[in-house]
């Protein structure tokens, strides 16, 4: 009887140890599974650990059909082969001896401890999320090239024009500024030698202007006319492109301080005009000339429009010159901001100041930008056409903006001039101090020696 009790106690001890071992195995197998959901590297670690405690002796506790079924599952899911082999064991099958866990006992595996369908579902969900992140390529959008930036001061009237209907009677008026001044006397003779006819029916107070007629106009509705202003501008009315190029070539011989060709062709003004019945006017960017006027009155109205166009193109040239000057002094505030020395001599600073004063003198003193010319004082109808065209071309606003820019440009140049004057005064003071020191040394030498 005591022997029977001892065997029963020993058997219960083995049962408890086996149950405890099953709990340890389940806990150790579930922990890597949770880590497997987070990272793919943990999946490889599980496979390596399971390969250690799954020797070939495991097949001894399985029948033949179960081994074949297990091998088929292993071929389907190669990465999950150790776990699938453990899942397909029945009640007679046992887990292999696991030396890695520090024991030689074999414990019975609980069939529903790990559900392969649940585990495969987790893996599919994990790999599907990974694949969506890795398979989507990064799209490289092509860089769009920016369009070329136009001049900051350029405001051609053509950009403000509304869309007009196609009209066969529509003619063109184009203005260019090619130089600072023209020799009108020599130009008149040169153009007359090329077959152009001078119009001499202008009033006596319309000085500093030359009007030439063209035989072959661009369209038959209006005779071709060219206005040359002494200020260095030319306005073409209903003139062919071929004739315009020829006149511009002849004009090069009589220019004083000509401008760059590219700048001349860029800073131009072009308006469309048409002959109508009624009073002449500028309506929505289109010149409408009275068709009932005689030749002399039509020339005067064209002169009013041409005068405003001349001011616009001259102002555009000076705006471009001011922009170029601003770029030349742009390094001064940048150098002062960075604490660097400004490498400008006193002569260069005075030259910059002279350029500013010359440009301001041209705009405010030697041109008609600020006041209406005397020619329009007793001609109210022509003054209205002139003012309307100047307003359309924004001449008053552009002159105001340009004067403000000139005022701002004077500040860094004045600063540099004062700085150079202070350096010169400091240099003179040091020279005086050195001379006084030398004189004192001579006096001391005379006293003591």
UniProtKB/Swiss-Prot annotation:
It comes from the Eukaryota. Pfam families: DUF155. GO terms for biological process: positive regulation of mitochondrial translation; translation. One of its GO terms (cellular component) is mitochondrion. The keyword Protein biosynthesis applies. The keyword Zinc does not apply. Its main location: mitochondrion. Residues 1-16 form a transit peptide. Keywords: Mitochondrion, Protein biosynthesis, Transit peptide. InterPro entries: DUF155, RMD1/Sad1-interacting. It is found in: Mitochondrion. Belongs to the RMD1/sif2 family. Required for mitochondrial translation, possibly by coordinating the assembly or maintenance of the mitochondrial ribosome. Homooligomer. This is Required for meiotic nuclear division protein 1 homolog. It comes from Pongo abelii (Sumatran orangutan).
């Amino acid at each position: 009887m005591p022997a029977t009790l001892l065997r029963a106690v020993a058997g219960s001890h083995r049962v408890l140890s086996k149950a405890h071992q099953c709990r340890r195995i389940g806990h150790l197998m579930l922990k890597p599974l949770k880590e497997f959901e987070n990272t793919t590297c943990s999946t490889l670690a599980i496979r390596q650990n399971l390969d250690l405690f799954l020797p070939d002796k495991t097949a001894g506790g399985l029948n033949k059909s179960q081994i074949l079924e297990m091998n088929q599952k292993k071929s389907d899911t190669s990465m999950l082969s150790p776990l699938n082999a453990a899942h397909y064991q029945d009640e007679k099958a046992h887990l292999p001896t696991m030396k890695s866990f520090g024991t030689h006992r074999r414990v019975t595996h609980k069939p529903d401890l790990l559900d392969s369908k649940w585990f495969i579902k987790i893996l599919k969900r994990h790999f599907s999320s990974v694949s969506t992140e890795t398979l989507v390529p990064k799209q490289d959008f092509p860089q769009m090239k920016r369009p070329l930036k136009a001049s900051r001061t350029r405001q051609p009237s053509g950009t403000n024009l509304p869309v007009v209907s196609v009209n066969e009677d529509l003619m063109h008026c184009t203005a260019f500024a090619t130089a600072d001044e023209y020799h009108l006397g020599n130009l008149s003779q040169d153009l007359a030698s090329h077959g152009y006819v001078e119009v001499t029916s202008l009033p006596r107070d319309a000085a500093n202007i030359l009007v030439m007629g063209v035989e072959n106009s661009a369209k038959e509705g209006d005779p071709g006319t060219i206005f040359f202003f002494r200020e260095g501008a030319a306005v073409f009315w209903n003139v062919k492109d071929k004739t315009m190029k020829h006149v511009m070539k002849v004009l090069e011989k009589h220019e004083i301080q000509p401008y760059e060709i590219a700048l001349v062709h860029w800073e131009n003004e072009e308006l469309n005009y048409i002959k109508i019945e009624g009073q002449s006017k500028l309506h929505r960017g289109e010149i409408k000339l009275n068709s009932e006027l005689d030749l002399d009155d039509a020339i005067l109205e064209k002169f009013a429009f041409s005068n405003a166009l001349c001011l616009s193109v001259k102002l555009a040239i000076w705006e471009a010159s001011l922009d170029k000057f601003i770029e030349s002094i742009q390094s001064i505030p940048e150098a002062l901001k960075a604490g660097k020395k400004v490498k400008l001599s006193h002569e260069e600073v005075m030259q910059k100041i002279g350029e500013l004063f010359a440009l301001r003198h041209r705009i405010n003193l030697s041109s008609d930008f600020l006041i209406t010319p005397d020619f329009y004082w007793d001609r109210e109808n022509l003054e209205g056409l002139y003012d309307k065209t100047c307003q359309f071309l924004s001449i008053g606003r552009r002159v105001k903006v340009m004067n403000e820019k000139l005022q701002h440009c004077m500040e860094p140049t004045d600063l540099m001039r004062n700085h150079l004057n202070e350096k010169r005064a400091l240099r003179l003071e040091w020279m005086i101090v050195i001379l006084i020191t030398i004189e004192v040394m001579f006096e001391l030498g005379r006293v003591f020696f």
